[in-house]
Amino acid sequence: MGLQFLAPGEKVFPSLHRIIISTFALIAAYIFIVRPLRNILFHPLKKYPGPKLFGASSIPYGFYYMTGKWHLKIRNLHATYGPIVRIGPDELSYACPEAWEDIYGRYVPTKRRENPKPVWYCSPDAHDMVGASLGDHGRMRRVMAPGFTYSAMCKQEPLIKGHVDMFLSKLCSLCGDGRAEVNILDWLTYCTFDLIGDLSFGEPFGCMENNMLHPWLQLVFANIYITHIILLCQRIPFFYLFLPIKTTYQLWRDFRRHVVLLREVVERRLSLSTPRDDFLDVMTTKQTSTLYMTKEEIFKNAILLTGGGAETTSSSLSGMMYMLTMRPDVKEKILEELRDTFPSEDDINMRSVAQLTYTGAFIEESMRYYPPGPNTMWRITPPAGNTILGDYIPGNTIVGIPHRVLYRSEAYWKDADGFRPERWLPDSQRPAEFDEDKREGFHPFSYGPRACIAMNLAYAEMRYILARFLWHFDIEATKESKKWMDDQKAYLVWDKPGLFVHLKPRAGVKVAA
């Protein structure tokens, strides 16, 4: 009966075309209007200061991260809004040293749950310490800890010394009898990856021998941008629209091929019956029913130690080399300390360099000024939420501390943008103007039970390499490298251009063959 009221030619049902358009319009209205308004007006984090646009959607954050300039934007946001800033609908950034314990500290029953790493950042299925669950992380860390003790470092020193000898010898051959222009970043990368690779896989990558990065490492360094955009896409699927499909597929294919080759290296090392005092020795000996590592965990942690350990060390050392070229006064103070402490190069070893007070202060200041991990190491509150700085934070909130922002904050550091190694000297030697610096808030290797297990080894290596390098060479900036730090892009690590310097061997100093 009702059909008789329809106008001539009018359809009972709308066309499929109109249904599709209406559906997309509703979805778009929800994504771009309803959800952003809900995030601004009704979200549990609405009380925290920050730009409304960032509180409405994660997309503005994602665009800044894609450009590699997020470390600059987040500093401006903290300067405008204060130490706690809402930078996404469900994300808070803390630029205050008091937050380290609450965000990265250990699980304390009845007081604080652990804030795990988000699965899009570090998956528990990765079989390494970074993404492992609380129990698996503790088990793996207890297995590996003996490899990073003082006594283990002493056993590893001959191997480390051999690689540093080759590093110095290669630089000396490049210089010949005079001054040479050298990309010191490349050679620091070759040295640290050969060294850590030898400790992790049982053989070096051959970077110094071949004057080039191993193909696996070339793949990693040539695709820093793509690998970090993939990480961003896993967090914010919208950015898959900007992912170059062909390049990403080639990267995935090449990684799979190199993983097969690296597995063969590990198998070859594990088949050896002779102990080498390396990390694989530690991971495979004295295993029990509760203290063990599977073969997959051994392999994945070997990759983790190589990539994470070597990149952090080479990045930090390159920052130090740059500062030596820009601050000749600081370089002279380090040289004076070396000459006063060591009668000869034979006295320089990984234990004796620990007594270098000013050199140690220089290393700390270099990592404050140019932290190897400039941005945030993300954590996420558990589903039941957590308490941070006395405030309840809802579950599944992303939280973290941006290293570079905290270390350059005038609220916590005197002359924060100045390079002042003396701020790290012992109390009796430190100028009074730095007494209020928040040195206890400085954690370049992270904080808590998941802090870098190789931190002490990294510090010893950096002191040792730096001391022996300056014993052998004078270093000066080239014209093109004087602004080396100025325009670098930053993701989880720095995307660094070549650091070209002038090297000149010191008269009368010979390098071991």
Curated annotation (Swiss-Prot):
Protein's cellular compartments: Membrane
Q: In which pathway does it act?
A: Mycotoxin biosynthesis
Kindly list the positions annotated as binding heme. Answer: 452
Q: What is its main location?
A: membrane
Q: How does it sit in the membrane?
A: Multi-pass membrane protein
One GO cellular component term of this record is:
membrane
Which keywords accompany this UniProt record?
Heme, Iron, Membrane, Metal-binding, Monooxygenase, Oxidoreductase, Transmembrane, Transmembrane helix
Q: So what family is this one in?
A: Belongs to the cytochrome P450 family.
UniProt function note: Cytochrome P450 monooxygenase; part of the gene cluster that mediates the biosynthesis of the phytotoxin stemphyloxin II. The first step of the pathway is the synthesis of dehydroprobetaenone I by the polyketide synthase sthA and the enoyl reductase sthE via condensation of one acetyl-CoA starter unit with 7 malonyl-CoA units and 5 methylations. The C-terminal reductase (R) domain of sthA catalyzes the reductive release of the polyketide chain. Because sthA lacks a designated enoylreductase (ER) domain, the required activity is provided the enoyl reductase sthE.
Name listed for the protein in its UniProt record: Cytochrome P450 monooxygenase sthF
